[in-house]
């Protein structure tokens, strides 16, 4: 009995049925097979999807290639079918007039040779220069203003076809050659018909005086077209300029003031379609390169860029290469070399510096009060002293230099233009770009720091096809510039005085980017010599 209870109450191991393990193994196997089947299906679908996508891309690529080939064939056919009476470009629809195309090539060659016109066209468009206003179709609101002039100037004739066509253009020509209308007419003409808002045309110039002059010329074009032109420059309060620029379509600005307005968030240049850099070489000389780069960076990347310059040095070439797209270069005369206007009679007198003011008074009385005379001093302090001397001598003189306010300078310039005063005294602030009509005589009281500035100074006379006189008082202090001056005189067919020849050839000073033209070039790798003081 006891043994039976022990058996009943003891631990007994209970084994699971065999068929339960088999069921579990079967389910696991089915689950695995199901998973593999699903993965296989997904892999197949993924492969089919990829093949379908590749097939679609292949077909699209094929269609695109066929479409391109068809388009090229069509264009080739159109070129073959086009008549020789016109030369056109599809970029903005400029079509060379049939009358211009009909002119004999000899007449075109004569114009190019007589005016020393050179066109470097990377697009090979082959546009002929516009010899008459009848050869160009301008908007009706602009044409009456332009046709008041007898005919286009050489820079206008050669550049207009490319500018109207929408190409980037570099114009290299002497000051007073009609450059403002060369870029102004195509720019205004091209924006009249569209309804785009905001600033459309931006012209950057190196000085306030030049900016105001360009503003006056462009206003002649914009006032009849329902467009507003404003001038932005330093020396006056910003408030009025900020207010005016909000409704403007055309802006003429000096780099410094424009950068100020950009930094203030007062002007938006993203809508600019036409960017003009006028007197580009002068702006680089004045150290505006970084400002120019900042300004250009704020404009529309699809803009048309125009650059006008009196000279074509390496720095200007590099600037053009950076910001312009396959620019057409139009040159009037040999602008790679420094050359003076051949219509100007140049006289150089070598003298004692102490005799200059006496000689100036003699020249002013000699040339009389019936013609406009422009006298150049080198520094503003000199200009102030000479102005006082001329007033004491009974001359009604107007003056523009750095010591005067912008209002005083503008008033003086206007007085000279109107003829209230026939004598203007200026420093080099007025030496470039200013279009002062009917200046007959330029007198260099003090020779400038460079022969380049000399050429720009005397370029104030002999403008727009007229003749002029340049009288220069030269001293021994400037003898290091005698050789370069003699080259300019000879190049323009002018006599070289014996006194100037006595200074001999010109040994060009070495120039350093940081230290200027008068530094001493030494080898910094050599050990310095010891100097003992007794």
From Swiss-Prot:
Q: Which residues bind ATP?
A: 173-180
* Catalytic reaction list: ATP + H2O = ADP + phosphate + H(+)
Q: Which residues form the Helicase C-terminal domain?
A: 359-504
A molecular function annotated in GO for this UniProt entry is: RNA binding
EC number(s) per entry? 3.6.4.13
The Gene Ontology biological process terms listed for this entry are: endonucleolytic cleavage in ITS1 upstream of 5.8S rRNA from tricistronic rRNA transcript (SSU-rRNA, 5.8S rRNA, LSU-rRNA)
**Which protein are we looking at?**
ATP-dependent RNA helicase DBP3
Task: Say which species the protein is native to.
Answer: Meyerozyma guilliermondii (strain ATCC 6260 / CBS 566 / DSM 6381 / JCM 1539 / NBRC 10279 / NRRL Y-324) (Yeast)
